[in-house]
Amino acid sequence: SAASDVYKRQGKENKPIAIGETAYEMYEKEPPSIHVSFPLQHGVIAHMQDMIALWNYMNYSLSGKKKIKGCEYYLAVPADITEVEKQAYSQIISRGETKPKKVFLVDKPVANAFGLGLDVEKLRGAMIIDVGADTTEISVLSLGGIVVSKLLPSGGNELDMLIRSYVRKEYNFLIGRRTAEQAKKELIAATTLDRSMKLVGRDVVKGLPGEITLTSAAVAPLATTFFETIITQARSIMEHTPPEISMDIKERGIYLTGGSSEIHGLAALLQTKTGVAVNISDKPQETAVSGLGYFAEHSKQAAKYVTLMK
């Protein structure tokens, strides 16, 4: 996601100068004196020092460059990662400059459930599919707990890579990651197959800058390939879910959230392939955050769902 991008200046101080969308806009255009880092990859922390720098920068930006101390922090993390990987999330805060009072970890499927407004304690069965940038987490919850959760190393960024590979193979043309992402948003979001857009890049044969025209009809099969990965896993989980819970999922429907869940066609194909209605989050990029907000405001009621890190 954009929030996990760090923009850093190389040198003795190595200070962040931008994060998020501002940093990403400079990606693939940076000079040698600038380094772009993606410290969070496939649901886990790939670069601890960069992640700590990102954390400090975010806090300074939100607090008017004042140090925040003595606060309680709630972090949503994938359920299907190791305890060591979960511990790394809490270390971001404990090793940063915020000096936390307490750090709580919440399994992201549970945070999503609360963010969706579900009565988690009485919930008999619900499937939540969280499609992010680098990962997709498919979870089944029942009676306040997670029955099963599977983290796939497949998110919206994979579709960007499929588009880049297709353009390279079919047109002998190289495009950057940001260009591929723009094509994804413009063409796959199209409700018809007659939309087109010009892509700027480099001709592999000539070795010179150029442009090509890509159509929504051309990239539609790529989207289907991406969707099928998610749908196949969702069906597999449903097939191995106890019958009583499966019936509740059938009645309640599948909940779809996450920034990449908005890619056109995913919800419709998921419903067709599973035979289960799909409920799309009103604010898919904010669902887990809304859940964390509930925990922060109702700490006593939420105590059973959070883990206090030491």
Outline where the language-model segments fall:
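Nucleotide/phosphate-binding catalytic cleft detector across ATP-hydrolyzing
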Residues: 1-128, 141-254, 261-283, 287-288, ...
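Short acidic, Gly/Ser-rich segments with clustered Asp/Glu that frequently serve as metal-coordination loops
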Residues: 133-135
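A structural feature that tracks compact, well-ordered secondary-structure segments
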Residues: 137-139
